[in-house]
């Protein structure tokens, strides 16, 4: 039997476990869907109950609790937990057509951080772009409409070809003058963000263009 705690905050998962652990759990598979929490952290002492704990995390942004589940068939699932029955848990999702990968408990937090950067922090960057567009006279709706082809096209290219082959723009070209103009039109906080992101872009650009001199941008 597979029992799961879905859609609960990490603190509440522990509370649910505290209510469950004195039940008859022999041979049960207990699963949670947290990205950052390991099975051992969520279900302390589960081995004493004769049960097996697993973290089953979909790499998927659930932005709408009523409709997001319809797209879960495309999600990549990352599983962590007791190795004894791990393949049985994976088989559930393999049979549904989902790709599955195993991860060690020690890597859960960094893995979840990677997912958050890709999903949540991208939203923050897009908001920064929308704010700049509005300073140029766009309203938010028209700015979003104007930027949509860039956003969607770029993400599609990255998904198909990776970041190195998808990189374009003034940093990739080592266009120092344009980068300087960009910095001059930003406030101090925006400049900090631009510089930090540009450092990452430079490292990608060096992979794409090994012979190009990025020294003046560093």
What is the meaning of each model-derived region?
Residues 1-12:
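Single conserved hydrophobic/aromatic residue that forms the stacking wall/gate
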Residues 21-26, 45-50, 71:
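Short, conserved loop/helix-junction motifs that constitute active-site signature segments
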Residues 29-33:
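N-terminal transmembrane hairpin
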Residues 34-63:
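Rossmann-fold NAD(P)-binding glycine/threonine-rich loop
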Residues 48-52, 67-159:
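Internal alpha-helical scaffold of NAD(P)-dependent oxidoreductase catalytic cores
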Residues 144-218:
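NAD(P)-dependent Rossmann-like dehydrogenase/reductase catalytic/cofactor-binding core
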């Amino acid at each position: 039997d597979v029992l799961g705690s879905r859609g609960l905050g990490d603190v509440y998962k522990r509370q649910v476990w505290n209510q469950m652990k004195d039940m008859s759990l022999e041979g049960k598979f207990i699963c949670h869907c947290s990205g950052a929490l390991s099975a051992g952290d969520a279900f302390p002492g589960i081995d004493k109950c004769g049960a097996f704990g697993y973290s089953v995390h979909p790499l998927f942004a659930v932005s709408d609790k009523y409709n997001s589940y319809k797209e879960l068939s495309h999600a990549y699932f990352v599983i962590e937990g007791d190795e004894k029955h791990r393949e049985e848990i994976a088989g559930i999702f393999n049979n549904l057509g989902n790709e599955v990968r195993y991860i060690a408990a020690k890597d859960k937090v960094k893995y979840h951080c990677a997912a958050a950067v890709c999903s949540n922090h991208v939203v923050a960057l897009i908001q920064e772009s929308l704010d700049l567009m509005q300073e140029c006279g766009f309203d938010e709706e028209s700015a979003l409409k104007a930027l949509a082809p860039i956003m969607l096209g770029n993400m599609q290219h990255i998904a198909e070809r990776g970041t190195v082959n998808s990189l374009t723009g003034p940093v990739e070209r080592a266009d120092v003058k344009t980068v300087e103009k960009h910095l001059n039109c930003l406030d101090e906080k925006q400049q900090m963000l631009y510089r930090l992101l540009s450092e990452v872009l430079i490292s990608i650009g060096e992979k794409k263009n090994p012979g190009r001199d990025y020294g003046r941008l560093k």
